Amino acid sequence: YEISACLVGSEMCIRDRSRGLPRTYGHKKGAETVRIVVESAIELDVEYLTLFGFSSENWNRPKDEVIDLMSLLRGYLVKEVEALDKKGIKFRVVGDRQRLDCDIVEMITSAEKLTADNAELTLTLALSYGGRRAISDAAKKLAMQVYKRQLNPNEICEEMFNQALETKMFPDPDLVIRTSGEKRISNFMLWECAYSEFVFIDTLWPDFCHKDLSAAINEYSGRNRRFGSSI
């Protein structure tokens, strides 16, 4: 399976349980959930797992919240990458790295190099990611090739566009899981999710666990994927 999950509900976790806790409490709980979901994905024979951790729109949140989220990301990279490597997990990041701090980019690059040859599971974090930006960036790449006379515009096809995307290294998602009861795509992998199956669950991301992932996969397995055909 190729599974993508939108990590929604960290802030709702705080609103629902205690108004006295800091906003970042839910994000910390959500970060802990990543470890649980990664382990569950391996147990359930998932080959590719993409987690939508920080969108391009999230930069518009309060500055102190963004700083705390970046601190959590640093902590995750420091604490978890070695463990991911030992478990045979390949680590990838997609998104606009130019907006990330230099030390974070260096840690990401180091983690990707360390785990490059692993094959147990490919874990991708979408950070500073936006589906529209990803599509426009791919279009710019192809447009530049046309401008340099390296490409005939009449030769451009879907597969060529796929190869221009930064997600070209893994297949389109079979299943997209949206937590917290939200029923929208939130600018996530707009091109790649054309024929994905969606499962919407009420569970908040910090509470997401093995049984939730298993239930979503079971629901997906019972569906008839037609990819636009009538059969």
Give the location of each predicted region.
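Short, exposed "boundary/linker" segments that immediately precede the start
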Residues: Y1-I3
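Flexible, compositionally biased loop and terminal segments
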Residues: A5-E11, R15-I231
